[in-house]
Amino acid sequence: EGLNLLNPSFTEQFLGTADAKRYQLSFAPLDDTAVTAELLQSDGSWKALAEGTDFSVDRTAGALTFVTPPGESPLDGQDNLKITAARTVEGYADRVGRCRVGILYGVGGASDRIFLSGNPDYRNRDWYSGYNDPTYWEDSAYSVLGRGDSAIMGYSILAGRLATHKD
């Protein structure tokens, strides 16, 4: 999953090896927020590991180095290391937060996503939320509709399809 426009936290999972101590996250630099790591146990539960005790964080590089390698997964083929960190991107929340128009819409008449537009800084762009999740707005979940000098003014549903109205 991509970064959430509304929340800087993200979680990545890894399939550990017997000797790997350093794990590179997809995003950097990281915020000063505490980084958490969890290690999969043989019973399927997750054991919390502590920053500063079990691992160190290079926030500039977006990498963790473990004192002891997390090792191989106790469950064949299943990721055994879960890391949660945060990376704030200035202006991300405003991309949807400054929108002025929206509608519920989904395929086949389901109302399972929110579509938003009307942000004066992104006049011809519309964003859509995660499936049945109005709290998740992936940073790449948007469409650019037509020319930038023609703003999206609203939405309607016509014959089961989402229509976008521009000025």
Enumerate the predicted regions with their spans:
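Short, well-structured beta-strand segments within conserved domains
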Residues: Q78-A85
